[in-house]
Swiss-Prot record:
Gene3D superfamilies: 1.10.20.140, P-loop containing nucleotide triphosphate hydrolases (3.40.50.300)
Chain positions covered by the region annotation Interaction with substrate tRNA: 9-12
Name by which UniProt lists this protein: tRNA dimethylallyltransferase
Enzyme kind, highest EC tier: transferase
UniProt signal peptide: none
Quaternary structure annotation from Swiss-Prot or TrEMBL: Monomer.
Similarity comment: Belongs to the IPP transferase family.
The encoding gene: miaA
One GO process term, biological-process aspect: tRNA modification
Alphabetical list of PANTHER family matching this protein: TRNA DIMETHYLALLYLTRANSFERASE (PTHR11088:SF60)
Pfam families: IPPT
Keywords noted in UniProt: ATP-binding, Magnesium, Nucleotide-binding, Transferase, tRNA processing
Source organism per UniProt: Helicobacter pylori (strain HPAG1)
Keyword field contains Phosphoprotein: no
Catalytic activity: adenosine(37) in tRNA + dimethylallyl diphosphate = N(6)-dimethylallyladenosine(37) in tRNA + diphosphate
Length: 276
């Protein structure tokens, strides 16, 4: 297939995280053009809006008829497809001030409920990411988030995208994750994270990712090497289960199949798309 690849992966977008993200090798990237890799420094934040901008840029400059969007950040994909409201523009100085304000709240969800019951009703009390984003809007605009979204409605994605997901038998998936974890550790995962953890702020977004956060616990002597491996495998399995459930419940017209079936379906679809 004559195509290019857009990486929708919340870890591969960072520079210097190569092992933990299982980033494509330089050789693989030389043969096939990849977008959205090595775009951010460790202390910068990624979000759905950034990926949407990068995806639109990639679609504009790609010389191929097909752009494959590949990755596990399904929440971002759903946000991009359904549309995103324009977020308020705030300076770095304001971001620090807002973060400080939010960190002083004893119960962020209760506070959100008090200033905007409408938006709070739509967010689960444990969904810290969305609570945080809503509070950022409030502190940046001094407007309840629900009113802000009313004034800045979502704009659905303008391009049609076909969706495919892999269905892998549980024991095979566990075996694959186990082998991948062993390979990562053997390739120098801990050393990679140690170099970054000593260099960047401890609250940097990538340090919360699976494979990274467990390595940090190992470096802080809270886990043995065996426990580190087991924790990465266990947490990756849980994530895979969540991703699978999310994909099946949140996307319409999702083609699910084995590696062979999905490959065949993508090839058939790409041929008809090019003809069309």
């Amino acid at each position: 297939m004559d195509a290019e690849i857009f990486s929708l992966d919340s870890l591969s977008i960072y520079k210097d995280i190569n092992i933990a993200s299982a980033k494509p090798s330089l050789k693989e990237r030389k043969n096939i053009k990849h977008y959205a890799l090595d775009h951010l420094n460790i202390d910068e934040k990624n979000n759905a809006q950034l990926f949407k901008t990068l995806l639109e840029d990639a679609m504009r400059v790609s010389s191929k008829e097909i752009l494959l969007i590949v990755g596990g950040s399904s929440f971002y994909l759903k946000s991009i497809l359904e549309g995103l409201s324009r977020m308020p523009k705030i300076s770095g100085e304001e971001v620090v001030k807002i973060e400080r304000e939010i960190s002083t709240l004893a119960d962020p969800y209760a506070f959100l409920k008090s200033i905007d019951p409408t938006i709070a009703f739509k967010i689960h009390p444990n969904d810290t990411y969305r609570i945080h984003k809503a509070l950022e809007i409030f502190y940046a605009t001094h407007t309840p988030p629900s009113e802000y979204f009313k004034a800045n409605p979502k704009k659905p994605f303008e391009h049609a995208i076909s969706l495919f997901a892999l269905s892998i038998e549980k024991s095979t998936l566990h075996s694959n994750i186990k082998q991948r974890t062993k390979n990562m550790l053997h390739s120098g995962l801990v050393e990679e994270i140690k170099a970054l953890y000593t260099q960047y702020p401890k609250d940097s977004q990538p340090f919360k990712a699976i494979g990274v956060k467990e390595s940090i616990l190992f470096l802080e002597k809270q886990l043995t090497l065996k426990e580190l491996e087991e924790a990465i495998i266990s947490n990756t399995m849980k994530l895979a289960k969540c991703q699978n459930t999310f994909n099946k419940t949140q996307f319409n017209n999702l083609y699910v199949g084995s590696v062979k079936e999905v490959r065949h379906a993508i090839l058939n679809h790409s041929k008809s798309a090019i003809k069309g």
